[in-house]
Amino acid sequence: VTEPACRVDIVFAPGVVAHRGTAEELVGRALDARSLTGELTFAADTAGLERAVRSAARRGEFVVVPGAGASFTAPAGGAIRVDFGECEADRSAGARVHIRGRGLDGLRYAVDSWYHHRFHPGRIVRYGDHPDQRVELRIPDGDGPFPVVVLIHGGFWRPRWESDLMDALAVDLTARGYVTWNVEYRRGGENRWATIASDVADAVQAVATVPSADPERLVILGHSAGAQLALRAAADATAEEAAVRPALAVSLAGVLNLRLAGERHLGEGAVADAVGSDWAGDRATYERSSPIARLPLGIPQLVVCAVDDEPDMLEMSREYHEAAAATPDDVVRIEGPGDHFTVVDPESEIWRRTAEAIDARIRPRTTPTPPPAARPRPGRGADPRTSRPSS
């Protein structure tokens, strides 16, 4: 891989960072983690920003921090936009991804997004008319049909967290021989609880449109709040005898008991915010939505959690496993060292064990499991010392 192919251009508008050195340090760590180089341009004025954006665009996809409400000109899908504060999504043609509301750490997520798109690109598939009703599809090399993994991201159902959180696992699973279907869904604002659930259900059914995917060998996998959505979707698809039904459901550090999570005000009240009520005010919705209340699901499950996760998260995984084990469901618990995000780190020991357990369930014993393909310019991924989303 040539040096220019590994260089990320990052352009800052005047005044968007409070301390330039801190931004440089954060970006430097993110680049080092991916074995990339970068050129940072801090524009002195609007004209300088426009020149820097034009220059960066000539070299390919770039990162731009234009400032809240500002616009910029870039080729279609040619930029990763970062806004440190909360704001409306940029739906303009020039922005492939808009990372917003994640603070200065949004720069790290932007570098990771650049890396995955540059070296392991997927294809966007729409399953609805809304911009958030989309998935990123990756297909392994070779002849299909392949088993498929549907990935559901977490982030406590809030709009600032998107499917880029699952890019690293999608890349790893594709290298292991799985079609990956990395789901985005509508969140927050006018998009209430029923909308979220219906989007995930529709995305799962849309797997049937992928010729190289084998829907009989479908895994639905969710992280944190995404695990709640994944297991609820699995329960619904099984109960309703949907055309596409998961063969395995995987919870990675999942929010598996909505009543408990709500009563403990996890994620600063995220459950009540998303559902639109507390448990006492809408017990029926909580019962339909909470994975532990849906047992038995009727399909095999893996329940994964790192032992240094937040105590509430670890407790929910253990509680769920114990409850599931008392039903006819086939359920396995996997624990190991790490925190809430170790379970979505492809380099971690607990993810290796999880991937092996998925293989054991989904692949015929006569079919050898391919090792993950060599990755250009490999890196360990996100710096665990930097901030992360909550669930």
Show where each model-derived region lies:
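Active-site-adjacent alpha-helix of alpha/beta-hydrolase-fold enzymes
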Residues: 29-30, 269-278, 306-331
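Catalytic nucleophile-loop/oxyanion-hole region of alpha/beta-hydrolase
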Residues: 161-170, 181-217
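The feature captures the conserved acid-bearing segment of alpha/beta-hydrolase catalytic domains
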Residues: 260-263, 278-315
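Hydrolase active-site cap/lid region
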Residues: 231-284
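Short, surface-exposed "cap/lid" segments of acyl-processing enzymes
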Residues: 9-22, 141-172
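C-terminal catalytic histidine-bearing segment of alpha/beta-hydrolase fold enzymes
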Residues: 2-12, 50-57, 62-63, 318-321, ...
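N-terminal cap/lid segment of alpha/beta-hydrolase-fold proteins
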Residues: 20, 25-46, 84-143
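Glycine-rich nucleophile elbow surrounding the catalytic serine of serine-hydrolase chemistry
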Residues: 222-232
